[in-house]
Amino acid sequence: MAEAVAAPISPWTMAATIQAMERKIESQAARLLSLEGRTGMAEKKLADCEKTAVEFGNQLEGKWAVLGTLLQEYGLLQRRLENVENLLRNRNFWILRLPPGSKGESPKEWGKLEDWQKELYKHVMRGNYETLVSLDYAISKPEVLSQIEQGKEPCNWRRPGPKIPDVPVDPSPGSGPPVPAPDLLMQIKQEGELQLQEQQALGVEAWAAGQPDIGEEPWGLSQLDSGAGDISTDATSGVHSNFSTTIPPTSWQTDLPPHHPSSACSDGTLKLNTAASTEDVKIVIKTEVQEEEVVATPVHPTDLEAHGTLFGPGQATRFFPSPAQEGAWESQGSSFPSQDPVLGLREPARPERDMGELSPAVAQEETPPGDWLFGGVRWGWNFRCKPPVGLNPRTGPEGLPYSSPDNGEAILDPSQAPRPFNEPCKYPGRTKGFGHKPGLKKHPAAPPGGRPFTCATCGKSFQLQVSLSAHQRSCGAPDGSGPGTGGGGSGSGGGGGGSGGGSARDGSALRCGECGRCFTRPAHLIRHRMLHTGERPFPCTECEKRFTERSKLIDHYRTHTGVRPFTCTVCGKSFIRKDHLRKHQRNHAAGAKTPARGQPLPTPPAPPDPFKSPASKGPLASTDLVTDWTCGLSVLGPTDGGDM
């Protein structure tokens, strides 16, 4: 009985069992929550995949649509190619492209032309159309060429009869080249127009090389140039502006009707032009104008028209000689004037220049001109330096009188001859002198800006502000001494020896306003004021350095030319500046002993002869350059008699 009764369960055991069950339930609940989260993430990913599948489907549909469009365009292109092939099989069709708004037309005077002129025109027309070949355009052969080949009078538009229909052209201003009929399925592309412009720029050299020699034509040799054949189109008028020629009027001008005054040029030649319609092609042949910029003097357009100058679009103007000028040049031994890329047109070339001899030429430098530094150059010296031994300042190296730069004739009047080196040319309103008249011509009437600084008291004007400041102090002095009574005005740069020079001597008026320093001469005050203002009015033409004094600029310029005019009589060393030579001579006097009485001094080395070639020790050749040891300029030998 006692065994049947179960042992009582301990409360501690029950509590432990309950706690274990609770922990298990909590773990199961946490696991269930994690499974729910993972399920939500899987659902989101599934939704994203569905969206991506929909987008792929849309893109695939778009790709299929584009592919269908490409297939349709390919079919259109294939049919277009077949149409072009069919057109090419017919020999009556030419592939060409005409300029915008133009068509081929022959001269109205076709019946009055000779056979050789008709043949020349036929070659020009055929070459023009062959040059403009392009696969983008396919139209029938022009009627003008068909009539020319058959020997008929071309392009008689007024004559009744069947006429080949023209290609329809869009009259709008931005339509471009002529558009063929829609049944040809030809559309003008922008690339074709760019190709035509490139052909115009290159001058169609291949066409010019393949044409027959114009020199074999019976009507002349000198009317056409090697560059004839270049094609360019004027978009405004539709004219081939790079084709024009001048044909001698003696051959067929007399047969033309008298009511064509525009056919003859100003120089007696005749242009082979077509009808003056802005919508038609004007086929002419012209001498190609070489693109050279004339830097000499500006030329008025009327002067060029008087000489029969022909102009082309985008090309620089150039002189063409008149018959009178050609005769004058041929009488002097040359056919054309000598050209210089810097100086432009000069006087007619002389026979000695054609034989290889050189002539002195000085290019005008930019700011400042060369005359501001050396006072003008003709044979290598200026008004501050003596000419080399053996040369007369009034004549050339060979003793010949100077020639006029205008007509090349010798000057016989002594009053018109160039002045000597010690008589500088004066420009009105300027105190600076120049060594020769060409230098005076090249020198401007006034420096850039003129004389902008004016005194309010006396009305005098000055070029520099420091000059005006110094003048105002002397003009408004308490003792009343002005530029006329003081020691020279600042504008003139004179000394202090005036009649009323008290202000210049005591320095009461010549005082620096910045530092209070007094000076006895206005030039010294001006030079001192430049230190405060930083003005350096003398720039170097070789480098970017500027100087306050002209003498310093000349000394600096000798470092560029390599000239050392000051030579020591003891050792023969040369120096750029005179003070360097004096310092060197003091070193000789301090280190060397004085020779005894009666003992001869050492003979100094002879200075180099400026007209002896260093290599041959003989007379200077015409192509050798000689350095002027007096002023540091390079000049040519005396055998060259050409003017600058």
From Swiss-Prot:
GO biological process, one term: negative regulation of transcription by RNA polymerase II
Compositional bias per record (Pro residues), positions renumbered to this chain: 162-176, 601-611
GO molecular function: DNA-binding transcription factor activity; DNA-binding transcription repressor activity, RNA polymerase II-specific; RNA polymerase II cis-regulatory region sequence-specific DNA binding; transcription cis-regulatory region binding; zinc ion binding
Tagged with keyword Ribosomal protein: no
Segments of this protein annotated with the region Disordered: 153-176, 324-370, 472-503, 581-623
Cross-link for Glycyl lysine isopeptide (Lys-Gly) (interchain with G-Cter in SUMO2), residue positions: K282, K286
Biased composition (Gly residues): 479-503
Entry comment on modification after translation: Ubiquitinated by PRKN. 'Lys-48'-linked polyubiquitination by PRKN leads to degradation by the proteasome and may play a key role in regulation of neuron death.
Residue ranges with Basic and acidic residues bias: 347-356
PANTHER family on file: CHROMATIN-LINKED ADAPTOR FOR MSL PROTEINS, ISOFORM B, ZINC FINGER PROTEIN
Main function: Transcription repressor that specifically binds to the 5'-TATTTT[T/G]-3' consensus sequence on promoters and repress transcription of PGC-1-alpha (PPARGC1A), thereby playing a role in regulation of neuron death.
Protein name: Zinc finger protein 746
Gene name, Swiss-Prot/TrEMBL: ZNF746
